Design a protein with these regions (language model features):
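Short, basic/polar amphipathic helix motif occurring as a linker/hinge flanking DNA-binding modules
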Residues: 62-87, 151
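Short alpha-helical "recognition helix" segments of helix-turn-helix
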Residues: 120-121
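Arg/Lys-rich amphipathic alpha helix in sigma70-family domain 2
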Residues: 37-44, 54-74
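Structural recognition of an alpha-helix C-terminal capping motif at a helix-to-coil junction
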Residues: 12, 26-33, 37, 46-58
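DNA-recognition helix of helix-turn-helix
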Residues: 57, 61, 103, 124-150
Length: 155
């Protein structure tokens, strides 16, 4: 029942955080396993959806860090793996994936999933000012990435 109720929201966030369907599915499954293992730590006054989202964000961070370590070992630049395409939606997805992890989490939870900023602050265990700044900076970076021609971008 928990899976059916929260799967779509968890998968959407995981996909936008990780960029790959297979990784997103793995993240959701890992989240549910971690929930099962840590159910004793769950405080009933907290919403289960928020608790699951916090676990998912941590799982995504873990997966991104592992991916970063593998990429460093393989020495493969991300630009060669995912070249930007002509489709604006694809460009937006790629631009979101290029954001730093915390900034990406704040932006995805706010702009894509519709979470209030205070809930995001609670989920990520940061101050609301940090969330607001991260969302603002994400919008600025995305605007720059999507309006500048690719050959004019500085990296």
């Amino acid at each position: 029942r928990v899976y059916a109720q929260h799967r779509q929201a968890l998968f959407g966030v995981a996909l936008r955080m990780l960029g790959r369907q297979e990784d997103a599915e793995d993240a959701v499954q890992t989240t549910l396993i971690r929930l099962y293992r840590s159910i004793g730590n769950y405080r009933s006054e907290a919403r289960l959806g928020s608790y699951l989202m916090r676990i998912l964000i941590n799982v995504c961070y873990d997966m991104l860090n592992a991916r970063k370590r593998r990429t460093e070992i393989e020495s493969a630049p991300a630009e060669e793996i995912h070249p930007p395409g002509p489709d604006l939606r694809l460009q937006l997805e790629e631009a979101i994936l290029a954001l730093p992890e915390r900034m990406r989490a704040c932006f995805v939870l706010f702009a894509v999933e519709g979470y209030p900023q205070q809930d995001i602050a609670d989920l990520l265990e940061v101050r609301i000012g940090t969330v607001k700044a991260q969302i603002f900076q994400a919008k600025e970076r995305l605007r720059d990435l999507l309006t500048d021609p690719p050959d004019m971008r500085t990296t």
